[in-house]
């Protein structure tokens, strides 16, 4: 695939899936402004590095990985994990939603990524493995452990 064709594929994916990338960034950083910055920086990097895209078929997974990497870079710069008190919760949110948000916030960053990708972004285990550069079995076992941690925190 030629460089111009790759750039076009990346640009089209960014346009078609912008909301999805924003939701992913927002679910990781829980700030509208920061999520917008992350998506903008991710889009720029995706276009500039489009020659490293190997196959058109994986463009969405590739861009999701860039968004996650940018969110991780954001946290490294801030040295601060998102706090439930900073979340924009509507009055319709129930105590269960708040408890779930707190439980998810208490997970390690990689664990939180897996849970968000699986249950909030509806990614398949295989897609998560590609995005996180892990084996499918590793993702499955981490997801299982995360669900156990969440269950204990929500029941206790």
Give the residues covered by each predicted segment:
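A short, charge-rich alpha-helical start-of-domain segment used by transcription regulators
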Residues: 1-23, 27, 33, 112
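Structural recognition of an alpha-helix C-terminal capping motif at a helix-to-coil junction
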Residues: 23, 37-44, 48, 57-69
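Residues within helix-turn-helix
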Residues: 33, 126, 137
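Arg/Lys-rich amphipathic alpha helix in sigma70-family domain 2
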Residues: 51-54, 65-84
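Internal acidic/polar
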Residues: 73, 80-105, 124
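Short helix-coil-helix linker/hinge
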Residues: 104-112
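A short pre-motif secondary-structure segment
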Residues: 114-118
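DNA-recognition helix of helix-turn-helix
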Residues: 132-156
């Amino acid at each position: 695939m030629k460089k111009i064709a790759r750039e076009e594929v990346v640009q089209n994916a960014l346009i078609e899936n912008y909301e999805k990338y924003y939701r992913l960034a927002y679910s990781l950083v829980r700030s509208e402004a920061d999520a917008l910055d992350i998506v903008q920086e991710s889009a720029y990097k995706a276009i500039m590095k489009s020659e490293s895209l190997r196959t058109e078929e994986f463009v969405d997974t590739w861009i999701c990985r860039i968004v996650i990497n940018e969110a991780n870079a954001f946290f490294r710069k801030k040295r601060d994990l998102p706090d439930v008190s900073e979340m924009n919760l509507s009055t319709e949110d129930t105590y269960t939603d708040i408890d779930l948000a707190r439980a998810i916030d208490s997970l390690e960053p990689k664990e939180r990524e897996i849970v968000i990708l699986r249950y909030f972004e509806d990614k398949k285990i295989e897609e998560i493995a590609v995005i996180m550069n892990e084996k499918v079995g590793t993702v499955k076992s981490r997801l299982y452990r995360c669900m156990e941690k969440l269950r204990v925190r929500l029941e206790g």
